[in-house]
Amino acid sequence: MRKNGRGELDLRPILLEPRVSKHAEGSCLVRFGDTHVLCTASVDEKVPPHVYGTGAGWVTAEYGMLPRSTHERMQREAARGKQTGRTLEIQRLVGRALRAAVDLRAIGPRTVTLDCDVIQADGGTRTAAITGAYVALVQAVRGIQKRRQLAQDPVKRSVAAVSVGIVAGQVHLDLDYDEDSTAEVDMNVVATGDGALVEVQGTAEGKPFPRAELDRMLDAALAGLSRLKELQEAALRTP
């Protein structure tokens, strides 16, 4: 039995609280247990140079951790003058994941930026960020639709993410920090609501793992992602 009485294939307590920002076109405060991430969506009526002139739009993301989101205070990256490789990797992952949810041409020549700010970290910040950012993205797109600026709905599918790993020889879903730090295998899985894979990041710590364990982890992750899809849908129904 895991913390809080969780079974090996149980998610942490999940909360997706939409519309928490007064100013952003879309927002969601997402909680995966003790990992809390504020996700906001902002719409800008212009596109980056590599998209300009194509008629398509763009979805991108930025990610950051508040100084005291961890056990000891971290220096702000702005104070250091540069982002870490980890930060750049995660925000690119979030952007790729969210672009899988939409038809960029249907968005039109505008950019939606998802800002994911970690308030408190206890493992799985990138997976929580993706799951909450999707809710914020849909709200922002619905706002554009209400202004009658879109001919069709650009959102084609939902996207969510979850971690999974091998801990003490057993598959565990949605790892917290302590589990992640001792896992023999650590994996992040991003998938659409219909179970199509967007991205799989997996690493063995110490020794390789067989294909059978990969399949077991993917099965566990996809089951958890099905539950996350339900929670996203419920959050988006909230008035």
From Swiss-Prot:
Reaction(s) this enzyme catalyzes, per UniProt: tRNA(n+1) + phosphate = tRNA(n) + a ribonucleoside 5'-diphosphate
GO molecular function: 3'-5'-RNA exonuclease activity; tRNA binding; tRNA nucleotidyltransferase activity
EC id: 2.7.7.56
One Pfam family this sequence matches: RNase_PH
Top enzyme category: transferase
Amino acids binding phosphate: 86, 124-126
Keywords associated with the record: Nucleotidyltransferase, RNA-binding, rRNA processing, Transferase, tRNA processing, tRNA-binding
InterPro entries: ExoRNase_PH_dom1, ExoRNase_PH_dom2, ExoRNase_PH_dom2_sf, PNPase/RNase_PH_dom_sf, Ribosomal_Su5_D2-typ_SF, RNase_PH, RNase_PH_bac-type, RNase_PH_CS
CDD domains named in the record: RNase_PH_bact (cd11362)
UniProt-listed SUPFAM superfamilies: Ribonuclease PH domain 2-like, Ribosomal protein S5 domain 2-like
Gene3D superfamilies named in the record: GHMP Kinase, N-terminal domain
Gene Ontology BP terms: rRNA catabolic process; rRNA processing; tRNA processing
Domain of life assignment: Bacteria
NCBIfam families hit by this protein: RNasePH
Family (UniProt): Belongs to the RNase PH family.
Cited function: Phosphorolytic 3'-5' exoribonuclease that plays an important role in tRNA 3'-end maturation. Removes nucleotide residues following the 3'-CCA terminus of tRNAs; can also add nucleotides to the ends of RNA molecules by using nucleoside diphosphates as substrates, but this may not be physiologically important. Probably plays a role in initiation of 16S rRNA degradation (leading to ribosome degradation) during starvation.
Subunit structure: Homohexameric ring arranged as a trimer of dimers.
Name of the protein in question: Ribonuclease PH
Organism of this sequence: Anaeromyxobacter sp. (strain K)
Lineage, broadest ranks: Bacteria, Pseudomonadati, Myxococcota, Myxococcia, Myxococcales
